[in-house]
Structures are given as structure tokens and as C-alpha cells.
Regions:
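Internal acidic/polar
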Residues: 75, 79-108, 127
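Structural recognition of an alpha-helix C-terminal capping motif at a helix-to-coil junction
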Residues: 25, 39-46, 50, 59-71
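A short pre-motif secondary-structure segment
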Residues: 117-121
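Sigma70-family region 2
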Residues: 5, 32, 43-60, 80-81
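Arg/Lys-rich amphipathic alpha helix in sigma70-family domain 2
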Residues: 50-56, 67-86, 148
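C-terminal flanking helix
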Residues: 20, 24, 45, 111, ...
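DNA-recognition helix of helix-turn-helix
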Residues: 70, 74, 123, 129, ...
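Short, charged helix-capping/linker segments at alpha-helix termini
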Residues: 5-14, 24-43, 134, 139, ...
Length: 159
């Protein structure tokens, strides 16, 4: 990260490659359209490259990068004037008891904000602290919403 901040283009490319899967998954959660995702990713990478010197704490690079992406996604949604529905999961979701279609259906019982939190926590493996920074929420609020979402999902699964 320090190398990228000092202008090392290859170091910057390595940082983006290390985070490409999380970037794509997060963009998919918000946009669900390949062209919009490509636009958001391109704008995010460009913005990150142009502003990496402003990153104060290198340990928060991923959170900072994801915040830029989420803002880009929100801008695209605003421009298109439509709401993002999260009725699909990113690839690679595995569960012994539920298949992908069942997971998709199961998450529909949650409100949009709770779905985002669950997906970021379980599928993108963000910590509560990182999610709170990404979604600009208090970490206690994220923990509470995550706990309530788990309880609701368990209740629905038991039916």
C-alpha cells in the first residue's frame, strides 16, 4: 500500500487484483447489471488511483476502496433512478443444507439493509467494524441487525 501511495503502478495493480473478487461481489449486490458493474469498477479504480495519496491509514485500504465503490454504485443507481434489489447471491455460496436457489429465496425475507449486512459479513468476509465503515453505521447497529437477521433466518429455516 505504501508503495502504491508512492506512485508504484505495479503495486497499485497488485492491490486491485487482491481485492477484485470483493469489488465485483459488492458491485453485484448493488447493481446486478454487468454494464453498470463494469462502469462502477472502472470509476472506482480510477478514483482510487487518483486519490490513493489521501489514504491516511494503509490498514484501512480495503474499507476505503469499498467505500469508493459503494458510492459509485449509489451514483449509478441514482442516475438510473431505480432501487437495487438483492435477490441474488454472488457466486461461490456453499451450504450443506441449502442450495443457491434456496439461499436466494431465504434472503428475500430480510429487508435490503439486513441482506447487505449478511452478504458482506458471510460472503465477503468483512468484519462488523468494516461493514459499519462501509455502510456508515454504528458498529453496534450492524451487530444488532446481523443478530436479528440470523434469528429471522433460523426461524424461517426451521419452518
Amino acid at each position: 500500500i505504501t508503495e502504491a501511495k508512492n506512485g508504484d503502478k505495479e503495486a497499485f495493480v497488485r492491490l486491485i487484483r487482491m481485492n477484485k473478487q470483493s469489488l465485483y461481489k459488492t458491485a453485484w449486490i448493488y447493481l446486478r447489471d454487468e454494464q453498470d458493474i463494469a462502469d462502477a469498477l472502472q470509476n472506482t479504480i480510477l478514483s482510487c488511483y487518483e486519490n490513493i495519496q489521501r489514504l491516511r491509514e494503509p490498514k484501512y485500504f480495503k474499507t476505503w476502496l469499498m467505500r469508493i465503490l459503494i458510492n459509485e454504485c449509489k451514483d449509478i443507481l441514482h442516475q438510473k433512478n431505480h432501487a437495487a434489489e438483492l435477490d441474488d447471491f454472488a457466486e461461490g455460496v456453499h451450504c450443506e443444507e441449502l442450495n443457491l436457489c434456496e439461499w436466494k429465496q431465504l434472503l428475500l425475507c430480510l429487508d435490503e439493509e439486513s441482506r447487505k449486512i449478511v452478504e458482506l459479513y458471510y460472503f465477503d468476509e468483512f468484519s462488523v467494524k468494516e461493514i459499519s465503515a462501509l455502510l456508515e453505521m454504528n458498529s453496534n447497529t450492524v451487530s444488532t441487525k446481523l443478530s436479528r437477521a440470523r434469528a429471522k433466518l433460523k426461524k424461517v429455516i426451521r419452518r
